[in-house]
Amino acid sequence: MAEFDITRIPRYSSKSSYAHFDHRVSFAEAQTKILDSEYVSHHAFYPLISNEIIAVRYRGGKRSCKVRNIAYASHFDHRVFQYYSYLWSDLYNKKAIAEEFNEVAVAYRSSLSSCGAVTAVSNISSAKMAFDYIREQDSAFVLTGDFESFFDNLNHVHLMTSLRSLFPSGRLPDDHYQVIKNILRYSCWPIADLAARHELPWPAIDPTREKMISDAAIELRFKSIRELNKLDVILPKSEFLANKSKVITRPWKRTGIGLGIPQGLAASGVLANIYMADIDMKVRLAVERVGGLYLRYCDDFIIAVPKSGFDALVEAINLMADVDSVKLQPEKTKVFRVDGGGVAQLDFESGRAGKVYPYSGVHPAQKVSFLGFDFDGRVVRLRQSTVGRYHKPLREAASAIARSNQGEGRHASKKRVSALYQHYSPLGIKGRGLCPSAGSDSSAFFRYGNFLSYVARAQKAFPNDPIAPDESKIYRKIKRLSAR
């Protein structure tokens, strides 16, 4: 194993704010036990707390919700998963370098190793790499897509085999086995039950009827979580022991063959990379023969080849379609031809069979989308859904201030107005007005910045594309909505 600088672990001396079955603990406080492999190999893990993250989206003025199941670990267990994720990431990085697919996986590549062989990349730099490659071609074929319920369908046997392959002996040390066993055979305590035990409201939702999920239900759940997180521990030990066998669920047992790992654990991302390692190597070899490009950001991927390399793209399509236990998401997996005339979507099944036929469905895509950016063959823009997630909370926050200003002598506080500008205006961009300058303490500096900070970084990466909005229009919108 490589030597790690443990103090570089994120939030090394900090405690998390959420409540769980154990007391809050920093990595620094738990370090002695976590670094003791004998202790870890016999450690009893708490159940995870399961919850649903509801993301509200606006596309073309229409509201939709995406419901994602997550589960989070107790404080000590999270630190264990965090540490072992770095150990596994280091082993994965060595394999990726040795077998020459190091440039493929661009997410969850953190390393505390002193070798520094892996350079972290962002979704912005990954999107730039992809679109720059496509622009360099006179004509190119492109495949974009992702996998349906990726984490829920990872095959346990395949994942264990892939993880064992990272160890020279082909066998997991006892402590590593104990950690991965508790990730694969995880149990969950639903947060709805915990809210009920504290007499907090938890509105039921139907994930299959996204349009029926109200903002009021989302807000009520959020308030209940906030109240739960004020607790020192989420349940007294006696109540935990008396009820755990009756309440906990084991989602991985649902099919009888061992599928799925929880999304949201510190180790989930690196395990996804390990799961995909063999496919990544095969796809990279296929497209590299024709000078192509393959990038994967967790379950999102893009493959691009020059026009002459269509056969390599067909091979890559079939490799991605045959990943063990996971399926491509049909509505998000698309084949394109990109040339001077723009972007034309092709029929996926025909492409898989080695034929180039136009897409025959309704509303063919006219843009290649990857990691929050759209490319129409000429320019790169932020996706409308990405921008929509900025404008909705801006409207809500500004309108709330406008309501506070109604009535004679009533005015929103300066602190509230300042927060509005920090969160949603160019003044909130790192290093400007309401944010610390680059000379500030770095730990504080990186906690600041808003969506427009991200936009500014994207504009810097794509200097000749219309990424950033007109700042004067943003100020006018804020003033109009807040009636200031």
Q: Where in this protein do the model-derived segments appear?
A:
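Non-catalytic, polymerase-adjacent accessory regions of viral genome-replication enzymes
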Residues: M1-S64, E471-R484
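A common structural junction motif
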Residues: F167-R171, M320-K327
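Short, conserved secondary-structure transition motifs
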Residues: K181-R197, T333-G351
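Short, conserved non-catalytic motifs in the polymerase core
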Residues: L48, E52-Q82, E99-T119, E199-D215, ...
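Short, glycine/acidic-rich hinge or "gate" loops at secondary-structure transitions
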Residues: K95-C115, D175-L184, G291-C298, P330
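Conserved polymerase palm-domain catalytic core
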Residues: Q137-Y297, I302-A316, V362-A365
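Right-hand nucleic-acid polymerase module
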Residues: S74, H78, Q82-Y84, L91, ...
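A short acidic-Thr-Gly-centered motif at the start of a beta-strand
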Residues: A120-V142
